[in-house]
Curated annotation (Swiss-Prot):
Pfam families: DPBB_1 (PF03330), Expansin_C (PF01357). InterPro entries: Expan_Lol_pI, Expansin, Expansin/allergen_DPBB_dom, Expansin_CBD, Expansin_CBD_sf, RlpA-like_DPBB, RlpA-like_sf. The gene is EXPA13. Its main location: secreted. GO terms for cellular component: extracellular region; membrane. SMART domains: DPBB_1. Causes loosening and extension of plant cell walls by disrupting non-covalent bonding between cellulose microfibrils and matrix glucans. No enzymatic activity has been found. Gene3D superfamilies: Expansin, cellulose-binding-like domain, RlpA-like domain. Residues 58-171 form the Expansin-like EG45 domain. Belongs to the expansin family. Expansin A subfamily. GO terms for biological process: anatomical structure morphogenesis; plant-type cell wall loosening. It is found in: Secreted, Cell wall; Membrane. This is Expansin-A13.
Length: 266
């Protein structure tokens, strides 16, 4: 058995309350392949066995507790070639096992959301133990996900993958954190392309202000927006834009999560 553990960023997060202040559009609860899915490409995949509940907390995309944030164990860590310095966080991939009749489960595939980064190990060659070294395209799955497409004894397994549209249940979520005039917003449960290219924030007494990517899907700005209702404009990697007005009341507090509108998924 080959165990491949992701480097996790452990965060001490308490579950925030989710508040509803604006109307939103829901998408189907189950993920499925979109009609415009990209072509299958070759890669390899390994797995890790989560032996502690904290193994589902953290990750380089900043989602915190993956179960409480709605991603569960249908998640994946990406090698440096695929990770794009965190810009790919939230994107959805379909994987299937290929080329090994001993270990593949025929006719199966699995849909996963990118939530973590598999760091390269330059002490090994890419064809040796450096599975996540450039230029390798490598996926690291929880064993619960890996076993849906292959027998666990497969170890470092040839797979095929493709990007697909994300289908999420419910609304896009905005978790506001920070302090003083520093505001950090974690955006989760994003449908459509799943990954985010740009974010703007607006207070009820300001115009639209561009936010910067802090890390993963955490976006930040230095602005005093206290005692103002907050609105968000989110642009995905496919250039679709969704604007959610007044998702929070003016007396919002750091640590709260609010729901806005959602990207439509074909």
């Amino acid at each position: 058995m080959q165990r491949f553990l992701l480097p996790l960023l452990f965060l001490a997060l308490s579950p925030p309350a989710i508040c509803h202040y604006s109307s939103s559009t829901s998408s189907p609860s189950s993920s499925s392949v979109s009609s415009d899915a990209s072509e299958w490409r070759p890669a390899r995949a390994t797995y890790y066995a989560a032996t502690n509940p904290r193994d589902a907390v953290g990750g380089a995309c900043g989602y915190g507790d993956l179960v409480k944030s709605g991603y569960g164990m249908a998640t994946v860590g990406l090698s440096e070639t695929l990770f794009e310095r965190g810009q790919i966080c939230g994107a959805c991939f379909e994987l299937r096992c290929v080329d090994d009749l001993r270990w593949c489960i025929p006719g199966t595939s699995i849909i996963l959301t990118a939530t973590n980064f598999c760091a390269p190990n330059y002490g090994f060659d890419p064809d040796g133990g450096g599975h996540c070294n450039p230029p390798n395209k490598h996926f690291v799955l929880p064993i619960e996900a890996f076993e849906k497409i292959a027998i666990w004894k497969a170890g470092n397994m040839p797979v095929q993958y493709r990007r697909i549209n994300c289908r999420k249940e419910g609304s896009m979520r905005f978790t506001v954190d920070g302090g003083g005039i520093f505001i950090s917003v974690l955006i989760t449960n994003v449908a459509g392309s799943g990954d985010i290219a740009a974010v703007k924030i607006k207070g009820s007494r300001t115009g639209w202000l561009p936010m910067g990517r802090n890390w993963g899907q955490n976006w930040h700005i230095n602005a005093d927006l206290r005692n103002q209702a907050l609105s968000f404009e989110v642009t995905s990697s496919d250039r679709s834009t969704v604007t959610s007005y007044n998702v929070s009341p003016k007396n919002w507090n750091y640590g709260q999560t609010f729901e806005g509108k959602q990207f439509e998924t074909p």
